[in-house]
């Protein structure tokens, strides 16, 4: 089995928001045991959904859950900069096009209990690939193997892929960048995703200016109190 290693800079970045995503993980657990296959999307690109997907998957794995992170943003994957391969890898598009077995695309990582399915090469027909029988076949095959499956999807405000993926998921989460996207666009994205039949689990407000709002700044909680003593 091919091994992927999360690069040090990304691991350090995830460490800074560890408590924030631990809180999100806890909220997901409280939302119901049935919510184990989750699609993560955003309105536009660059809002941090891939980073959020990775951080959430890390939090779940570090909490003791066997977790699979699937990079389904096959049009514009950024996870190749997060996980580096120790050898030649095949990814999701290889499997969906019938050029790889499921076992060929699930990669171990240097994080215990975390496995990853890379996106693979950019296909000429991303939406059509997701709509073929292989995607649902994959979900059926792995859903009882892992405690949680986190799927990073393309932005729903740009392409319909995220809604197609969400149709096979228990729920979805919207990631939005603070101060960038108007509320009506976020609401429209939520409605588009809900049309898939998937359950809306919440919004992750990303890239918050901490000089303006420090809510969620869990990393400093307790440190200020210790300094006062």
Curated annotation (Swiss-Prot):
The keyword Oxidoreductase does not apply. GO terms for molecular function: ATP binding; non-membrane spanning protein tyrosine kinase activity. Its EC number is 2.7.10.2. Pathway: Capsule biogenesis; capsule polysaccharide biosynthesis. Gene3D superfamilies: P-loop containing nucleotide triphosphate hydrolases (3.40.50.300). Keywords: ATP-binding, Capsule biogenesis/degradation, Exopolysaccharide synthesis, Kinase, Nucleotide-binding, Phosphoprotein, Transferase, Tyrosine-protein kinase. GO terms for biological process: capsule polysaccharide biosynthetic process. One of its GO terms (cellular component) is plasma membrane. It catalyses: L-tyrosyl-[protein] + ATP = O-phospho-L-tyrosyl-[protein] + ADP + H(+). Pfam families: AAA_31 (PF13614). Autophosphorylated. Dephosphorylated and activated by CpsB. Involved in the regulation of capsular polysaccharide biosynthesis. Autophosphorylation of CpsD attenuates its activity and reduces the level of encapsulation. May be part of a complex that directs the coordinated polymerization and export to the cell surface of the capsular polysaccharide. Belongs to the CpsD/CapB family. This is Tyrosine-protein kinase CpsD.
């Amino acid at each position: 089995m091919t091994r992927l290693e999360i690069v040090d800079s990304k691991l350090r970045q995830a460490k800074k928001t560890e408590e924030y995503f631990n809180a999100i993980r806890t909220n997901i657990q409280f939302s119901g045991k049935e919510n184990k296959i989750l699609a993560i999307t955003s309105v536009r690109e660059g809002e941090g959904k891939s980073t959020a997907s990775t951080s959430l998957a890390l939090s779940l794995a570090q909490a003791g859950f066997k977790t699979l992170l699937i990079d389904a943003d096959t049009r514009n994957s950024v996870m190749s900069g997060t996980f580096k391969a120790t050898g030649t890898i095949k990814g999701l598009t290889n499997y969906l096009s019938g050029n790889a077995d499921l076992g060929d695309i699930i990669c171990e990582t240097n994080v215990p209990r975390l496995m990853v399915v890379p996106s693979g090469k950019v296909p000429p027909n991303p939406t059509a690939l997701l709509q073929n029988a292989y995607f649902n076949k994959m979900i059926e095959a792995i859903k009882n193997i892992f405690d949680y499956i986190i799927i990073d999807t393309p932005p729903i405000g740009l392409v319909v892929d995220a809604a197609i993926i969400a149709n096979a998921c228990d729920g979805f989460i919207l990631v939005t960048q603070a101060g960038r996207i108007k509320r009506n666009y976020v609401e429209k994205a939520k409605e588009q995703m809900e049309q898939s039949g998937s359950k809306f689990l919440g919004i992750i407000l990303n890239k918050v200016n901490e000089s303006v709002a420090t809510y969620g700044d869990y990393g400093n909680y307790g440190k200020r109190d210790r300094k006062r003593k």
